[in-house]
Amino acid sequence: MLGAELADTGLFVRFGALHFAIASVAVLLSALFVLLPFALPRLLAHKNLARAGVAILFLRLGLMLCGTLLDGRSWRNELPFHLCPAALISGSLYFITRRPIFFNLLYFWHFGSFVAVLYPDLTRAHTILYAYLFMLTHCLEPAMVVFSLLHLRERISKRGLQCAVLGFLLLAANALFWNRRLGANYLFISKYPLEILRVIRPFFVYQLLFVSALCLLMLVLYLPFRPSQHGRNQLFVI
């Protein structure tokens, strides 16, 4: 029944029944990902974490292939040059290598996943599989953050913030480069993503405000982890 919305019209209605159903499944699977180690502590072994990281990378690859081969999307729009896939890949590399810098990148870059789940770029789709993979890969980003904080006791560092901001600026430069050549809008930095934003003119002012706002948001995300007067991390350690 729910799939008929997609099969009959090719349209994915935001906040429709299908949107709610797919998002709910993705949230439940992501919650299960976080909660399973309480029942099965052996899942926290390094080899199992590495397998999870590889599996998540394959999920992302599956999303790209499904989009281009089954859903009729242009490969130009499926390359992982947005912030969300960069965060997901960083999280996967953290699970594989356990290097804190990758967790820091995941943490500071994952906030876009919430917007993607609420306002998915699925206004036109042909396969329900793509919609499920899209929602699941985005829901896994905050789940990986919670998993790492809760089970692996990972923490954010000032150096991690600096690397995340610098990395984001490099991603923005990369997006501008490929947007010009492919006609895409990676990082939403070459075209207005929403009509309401067209009031911000000239366009370079929008670009400057957009980049500045995301850098400021990363700084805000760092505040719970800043050292206290006693030199301890301010975030409560569970």
From Swiss-Prot:
Predominant place of localization: membrane
Topology in the lipid bilayer: Multi-pass membrane protein
Protein's UniProt keywords contain Cell division: no
UniProt entry keywords in alphabetical sequence: Cell membrane, Membrane, Transmembrane, Transmembrane helix
One GO cellular component, as annotated: plasma membrane
Compartments, record wording: Cell membrane
Alphabetical list of Pfam families matching this protein: TMEM164
Transmembrane segments: 15-37, 50-69, 79-96, 101-118, 128-150, 163-183, 203-225
Cited InterPro entries: CHP02206_TP0381
Name of the molecule in the record: Uncharacterized protein TP_0381
